[in-house]
Amino acid sequence: MSISQVIDTSFHEEVINSRQPVLVDFWAPWCGPCRMIASTIDEIAHDYKDKLKVVKVNTDQNPTIATEYGIRSIPTVMIFINGKKVDTVVGAVPKLTLLNTLQKHLKST
């Protein structure tokens, strides 16, 4: 499954209205730690393609949604289920940390 780039105007439709759980990666092109976890996000998108939608939000180009969700540091990864934010992971964390957080919420869906 490919990762969609979501913008301020499409966030509601792509994330809030999604019937699938959604992992949202808030990032920026200049952010070194964002580039460090990019391959992890790609792997998760591939490995969970039947269970999870993965999208990216460029915070430089989409400041409205970044502000709405209180993004102060990037990368920030948020998990949404049924249109509600259920968890947040801030920083370039190990893949296992993201997977454990994700598994915790996917078990309940």
From Swiss-Prot:
Pfam families listed in its UniProt record: Thioredoxin
Principal cellular location given in the protein's record: plastid
Site (described: Contributes to redox potential value): 32-33
Residue span, Thioredoxin domain: 2-107
Active-site residues per Swiss-Prot or TrEMBL entry: 31 (nucleophile), 34 (nucleophile)
GO CC aspect terms: chloroplast
InterPro entries: Thioredoxin, Thioredoxin-like_sf, Thioredoxin_CS, Thioredoxin_domain
GO molecular function: protein-disulfide reductase activity
UniProt keyword annotation of Transferase present: no
Cysteine pairs bridged by disulfides in the record: 31-34
Subcellular location: Plastid, Chloroplast
Site (Deprotonates C-terminal active site Cys): 25
Classification via Gene3D superfamilies: Glutaredoxin
Keywords: Chloroplast, Disulfide bond, Electron transport, Plastid, Redox-active center, Transport
Its job: Participates in various redox reactions through the reversible oxidation of its active center dithiol to a disulfide and catalyzes dithiol-disulfide exchange reactions.
UniProt-listed PANTHER family: GEO12009P1
Family per similarity comment: Belongs to the thioredoxin family.
NCBIfam families for this protein: thioredoxin (TIGR01068)
Protein known as: Thioredoxin
Organism: Griffithsia pacifica
